[in-house]
């Protein structure tokens, strides 16, 4: 059920955070502990499938639910936007990594256009891995991990490069 899956996703996040994971997830263990607000990842894990069974696209329905939740609890605009984006886009990284060529620069360009920040990339990577691992133990394997990691690393390089170029143009404008 969705409830069981949600508990497994959150459990996986916690195990990753404290390091109770396969050694192949060492980088992910380090990354999850560098997230600025890990509670947003946990909330994304709780909310990501909440729209299922309500008729329509569960990602979009979940996005609306999380927006109301954040508003009711006076979350900052930034945190509301990040959490809503994560819920709405929680399937994108898995889909792109498994249905397109993660080595193709065009794939990376299109993916990073949607993600557009390193912060979102880090969160969506953590959510995606723990979502897949929480779905069915046989769904998670080294092939899927390698594809996701390749998409993550290539996207991180591209976003870092864009950030450096943006900073250089800001400095040039100030001269």
Task: List PLM regions with ranges.
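Active-site-adjacent "gating/activation" loops or surface patches in catalytic cores
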Residues: 1-45
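Divalent metal-dependent catalytic cores for phosphoryl transfer on phosphate-bearing substrates
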Residues: 28-161
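Extended, charge-enriched "interface" segments that sit outside catalytic cores
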Residues: 160, 164-175
């Amino acid at each position: 059920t969705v409830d069981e899956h949600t508990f497994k996703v959150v459990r996986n996040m916690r195990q990753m955070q404290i390091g109770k994971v396969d050694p192949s997830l060492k980088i992910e263990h380090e990354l999850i502990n560098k997230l600025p607000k890990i509670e947003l990842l946990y909330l994304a894990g709780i909310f990501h499938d909440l729209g299922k069974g309500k008729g329509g696209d569960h990602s979009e329905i979940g996005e609306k639910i999380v927006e109301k939740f954040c508003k009711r609890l006076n979350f900052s605009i930034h945190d509301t936007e990040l959490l809503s984006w994560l819920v709405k886009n929680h399937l994108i990284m898995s889909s792109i990594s498994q249905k397109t060529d993660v080595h193709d620069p065009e794939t990376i360009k299109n993916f990073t256009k949607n993600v557009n920040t390193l912060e979102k990339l880090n969160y969506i990577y953590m959510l995606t891995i723990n979502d897949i691992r929480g779905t069915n133990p046989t769904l998670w394997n080294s092939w899927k991990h390698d594809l996701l990691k390749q998409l993550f690393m290539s996207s991180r390089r591209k976003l870092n490069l864009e950030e450096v170029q943006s900073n250089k143009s800001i400095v040039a404008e100030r001269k």
